[in-house]
């Protein structure tokens, strides 16, 4: 029951990387995970993705980081132990863990496959388990995890874990809202604002859906990679008013992947057809102006979205495997982590980082 607490047996020795305080200084952190229960899966972590959100959480940008903090909400590995009542997995299976490791299981959202919108979620990193008397969860940037089998994902056989692990963040973040709004149908024309970690994978999904992808970016230098490397059909700089006007009323949807609200809402709404939709998956730090007239006259919509439920997580991995979709990923060792965080801060990454945990992070007494 929500609100009840029971002291857990914490016996699994673990080591992760994270921060002791808001200075953001990264360091090894030793801790204990719970003893695997009858429905738990014990996982040897092999890869952990790193993204902008991790950098912000390490430095307590949003004001709710709990220290010591071990980050990691996109994790891939292999099963090394299963509880007596686990049915989905066996030792040796390749698996993944996304941003959630628990939820209440009783609310409307949980009952309808939207566990990510549970009002009492247990996030993979930094959440406080209801049953653990205030002990925070520790993320996947560690050598081992213990997770309820419900929140463990089956890893497709033909999907590489090193370049596939960012799908547990960047992939689900764009897949979920596009599917929900029907933009996964062939023939849809979708604009993608920004060509970073989210935008690049959005383009790949759109093309696999059978749609048309137009990238809108602040940087002309990204045109070649958008079209030649990711398969975009068209590319427009967001200051090219002539080309943008020519695209007015042609798009079924626009996915804004940028965090800074750099593209005016009026511009995005102007690109939409009647009944079109703007999907906000970035997190603007400032308020933007909302032009109401284009919404009313075109019956257009603006929606926000945050990751996806467990079913959608699995669908994302399976769809990516079916269409040979992986993320453009730079695989690094744990000793490079501080440099990687600085590069993320300076927008110097193309397009995601994944830490080779299995070969570079070991527990030592």
UniProtKB/Swiss-Prot annotation:
The gene is GS. Homodimer. The keyword Coiled coil does not apply. NADP(+) binds at residues 52, 195, 197-198, 217-219, 222, 262, 281, 283, 305, 307, 352. The strictosidine aglycone-producing AJM7-DeltaHYS yeast strain expressing pathway genes of the VOM module, RsGS, SBE (GsSBE, RsSBE1 or RsSBE2), RsPNAE, RsVS and RsVH, accumulates vomilenine. Additionnal expression of pathway genes of the AJM module, RsVR, RsDHVR, AAE (RsAAE1 or RsAAE2) and RsNNMT, leads to the production of ajmaline. Ajmaline is an anti-arrhythmic alkaloid commercially used as an efficient drug for the treatment of arrhythmic heart disorder. Keywords: Alkaloid metabolism, Metal-binding, NADP, Oxidoreductase, Zinc. Pathway: Alkaloid biosynthesis; ajmaline biosynthesis. The keyword Cell wall biogenesis/degradation does not apply. Zn(2+) 1 binds at residues 51, 73-74, 169. Its EC number is 1.3.1.36. It catalyses: (19E)-geissoschizine + NADP(+) = 4,21-dehydrogeissoschizine + NADPH. Alcohol dehydrogenase involved in the biosynthesis of ajmaline-type monoterpenoid indole alkaloids (MIAs) natural products, important plant-derived pharmaceuticals used in the therapy of heart disorders. Catalyzes iminium reduction on 4,21-dehydrogeissoschizine to produce 19E-geissoschizine, precursor of vomilenine, an intermediate chemical in the biosynthesis of ajmaline. This is Geissoschizine synthase. Zn(2+) 2 binds at residues 104, 107, 110, 118. Binds 2 Zn(2+) ions per subunit. Mainly expressed in roots and, to a lower level, in leaves. Its cofactor is Zn(2+). Belongs to the zinc-containing alcohol dehydrogenase family. Class-III subfamily.
């Amino acid at each position: 029951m929500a609100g009840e607490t029971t002291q857990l047996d914490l016996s699994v020795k673990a080591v992760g990387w994270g921060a002791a305080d808001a200075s953001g200084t990264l360091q090894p952190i030793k801790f204990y995970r719970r003893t695997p229960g009858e429905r738990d899966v014990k996982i040897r972590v092999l890869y952990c993705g790193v993204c902008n959100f991790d950098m912000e959480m390490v430095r307590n940008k949003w004001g709710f980081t709990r220290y010591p903090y071990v980050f990691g909400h996109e994790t891939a590995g292999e099963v090394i132990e299963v509880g007596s009542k686990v049915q989905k997995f066996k030792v040796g299976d390749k698996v993944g863990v996304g941003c959630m490791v628990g939820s209440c299981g009783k609310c409307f959202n949980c009952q309808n496959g939207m566990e990510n919108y549970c009002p009492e979620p247990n996030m993979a990193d930094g959440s406080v388990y209801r049953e653990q008397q205030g002990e925070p969860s520790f993320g996947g940037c560690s050598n081992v995890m213990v997770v309820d089998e419900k929140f463990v994902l089956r890893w497709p056989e033909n999907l590489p874990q090193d370049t596939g692990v960012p799908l547990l963040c960047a992939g689900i973040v764009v897949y979920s809202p596009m599917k929900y709004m029907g933009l996964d149908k062939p023939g849809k024309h979708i604009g993608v604002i920004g060509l970073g970690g989210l935008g690049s994978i959005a383009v790949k999904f759109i093309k696999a859906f059978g749609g048309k992808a137009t990238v809108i970016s602040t940087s002309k230098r990204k045109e070649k990679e958008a079209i030649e490397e990711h398969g975009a059909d068209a590319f427009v700089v967001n200051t090219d008013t002539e080309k943008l006007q020519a695209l007015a009323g042609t798009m079924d949807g626009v996915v804004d992947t940028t965090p800074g609200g750099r593209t005016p809402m009026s511009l995005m709404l102007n690109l939409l057809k009647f009944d079109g939709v703007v999907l906000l998956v970035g997190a603007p730090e400032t308020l933007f102006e909302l032009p109401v007239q284009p919404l009313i006259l075109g019956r257009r919509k603006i929606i926000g979205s945050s990751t996806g439920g467990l079913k959608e997580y699995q669908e994302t991995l399976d769809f990516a495997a079916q269409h040979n979709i992986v993320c453009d990923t730079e695989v690094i060792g744990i000793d490079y982590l501080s440099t990687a965080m600085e590069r993320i801060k300076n927008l110097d990454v193309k397009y995601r980082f994944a830490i080779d945990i299995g070969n570079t992070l070991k527990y030592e007494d």
